[in-house]
From Swiss-Prot:
NCBIfam families: rpsB_bact. GO terms for cellular component: cytosolic small ribosomal subunit. This is Small ribosomal subunit protein uS2. Belongs to the universal ribosomal protein uS2 family. GO terms for molecular function: structural constituent of ribosome. It holds the Pfam family Ribosomal_S2.
Length: 260
């Protein structure tokens, strides 16, 4: 049974791609049609590739892989953080700092500084420092937490990277590829899929779409680590038994109705 049903994908708007003038021709095989100047993603393929991504992530997690969630745009930031934490993994949901992976030793020094400032507050050092210095330290900590808080406890570079919108996260993807780290990603119709190891053709701009796909990747990690289905996965299977659009023709009807 598919990990994500056609009905769930439709309700989340996963089928809506970008305007046709913004497309990447390399995504042609994942596009079903065009309606009112918008490309419609072939959800039958999304179902298939989501299954493959789920299996890939689950198997990696079963082998104790470290998985880094990346999504820095506002539509993705909350889901990336929440689902990474739920799965016991790591995330970057604000600006990607160049060299996060390829210059890991420098990033580790910044993380060490973040931990040092936290210790200073906990052990009472802040109480004996001038207020101005404490204010500067708090400002530094806030900035470090914003960009590095999600990888503060990550012991080493990740084994797998999950990305929302690799078009926006091009630097992150390039660093991963340079280090041989496989990339699983939500890929919209405006993106070059060539650098993605496991592609999930999908709308990567709608909050509901991002939440749906990202939650399933977190479910895959939980299942891989626990060796059993998470509660969310079981609920998804039950939901998948409900009446749903079976054919791509029905999808087009829904799209036409939404765009009317």
């Amino acid at each position: 049974m598919a990990v994500i049903s056609m009905k769930q994908l439709l309700e989340a708007g996963v089928h809506f791609g970008h305007q046709t003038r913004r497309w990447n021709p390399k995504m042609a095989k994942y596009i079903f049609t065009e309606r009112n100047g918008i490309h419609v993603i072939d959800l039958q393929q999304t179902v298939k590739y989501a299954d493959q991504a789920y299996d890939f992530i689950r198997d990696a997690a079963a082998n104790d892989a470290i998985i880094l969630f990346v999504g820095t745009k506002k539509q993705a930031a909350e889901a990336v953080k929440d689902e990474a934490e739920r799965a016991g993994q790591y995330y970057i949901n604000h600006r990607w700092l160049g060299g996060t992976l390829t210059n890991w030793s420098t990033i580790q020094k910044r993380v060490a500084r973040l931990k040092e400032i936290k210790r200073m507050e906990e052990d009472g050092t802040f109480e004996v420092l001038p207020k101005k210095e404490v204010a500067l330290l708090n400002k530094q900590r806030a900035r470090l937490e914003k960009f590095l808080g999600g990888i503060e406890e990550m012991p080493r570079i990740p084994d797998v990277m999950y990305v929302v919108d690799p078009h926006k996260e091009q630097i992150a993807v390039k660093e991963a590829k340079k280090l041989g780290i496989p990339v699983v990603a939500m890929v919209d119709t405006n993106t070059d899929p060539d650098d993605i190891d496991v592609i999930i053709p999908s709308n990567d701009d709608a909050i509901r779409a991002v939440k749906l796909i990202t939650a399933k990747m977190a479910d895959a990690i939980i299942e891989g680590r626990q060796g059993e289905d998470s509660v969310e996965s079981v609920e998804a299977e039950l939901a998948a038994t409900e009446t749903q659009a079976d054919s791509i023709e029905e999808i087009v009807e829904v799209v036409e109705g939404d765009n009317a």
